[in-house]
């Protein structure tokens, strides 16, 4: 059974592993576990910045997505940015990504976001097809 929750500091080592899978696919990023840990910790420790949502199967993290908050000058209100969506290879095609996105959209609404912007790399055709 897949459960969806907000990430905690204890989840960071597993999140770094997932990010490294993602960054191997994205040409513009290099793996840097130290910086990844720092960024993850900054988001997790400050709910005003955003939230990292995780999917767990049998208590093991199998997916994640970041929902970051910022202010839109065009809309004059808070907006959400969704990025770093990754599901482990063995957990794909099981609805994990859909559950993560559903939670991200729900949290964006609960946090009064006027819109959500999704970031996906131009050459990540698999992700574009999913969305």
Model regions: which residues?
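Extreme N-terminal starter segment of soluble prokaryotic enzymes
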Residues: 2-3
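Acetyl-CoA-dependent GNAT
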Residues: 6-12, 17-77, 83, 102, ...
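Hydrophobic adenine-recognition pocket in adenosine-nucleotide-binding enzymes
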Residues: 7, 85-87, 120
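Conserved catalytic-core motifs of GNAT/GCN5-like acyltransferases
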Residues: 69, 117-121, 128
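Short coil/turn motifs at secondary-structure junctions
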Residues: 70-72, 90, 123-125
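Conserved acetyl-CoA-binding loop-helix of GNAT-fold acetyltransferases
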Residues: 87, 93-106
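Conserved active-site alpha-helix within GNAT-family acetyltransferase domains
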Residues: 98, 110, 122-131
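Conserved GNAT acetyl-CoA-binding A-motif
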Residues: 101, 108-119
